[in-house]
Amino acid sequence: MDLVQRAREQYSAGRMHDALEAAQAACDRAPKDAEAWWLLGRISRHVGLAAASDDAFRRASALTRSRPVPYRVSAGRFQQLVQEARESLPPAARRRLEKVTLRVQALPSVDDVRGGVEPDALTARSRGPHEVLTVFQVNHENRSGSETALRTLVARSLSRR
């Protein structure tokens, strides 16, 4: 099995340390593979290796223009972007979110991933007596190369709910 594929499978199953080893091996074996570096960046974030993650994302971005370096913001700034996006939604979308508690979390937990949440999910909704929509900051940042792109993606994520 291809190392990148193995890393993806481990990552999706919530076996982050196994995924990290496979992704590192894939990058060692094919140092010009932008997808391997991008995957290593995502996995490294999940295991708490922010500096290694940033380095992997920079390497991936240097290999392909289709992957800009993720735009990072503080937790407070991201919360502000979520609030601004919520307030700017069309009336119908705002009404859909009125009874929903919005929660910001850095990433899905390993337990969330093992329970079926995609590790790269932008949001997760838990239904019940009190509906909660969790917005994952890092996964939004990973797909955004600027604050404008981040703002747009957050608004799009909220409007889909």
Name what the model sees in each region.
Residues 17-18, 51:
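Residue register within tetratricopeptide repeats
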Residues 25-26, 60:
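Canonical positions in the second alpha-helix
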Residues 42-69:
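TPR/TPR-like (Sel1-like) alpha-helical repeat modules
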Residues 119-160:
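Active-site scaffold of zinc-dependent metalloenzymes
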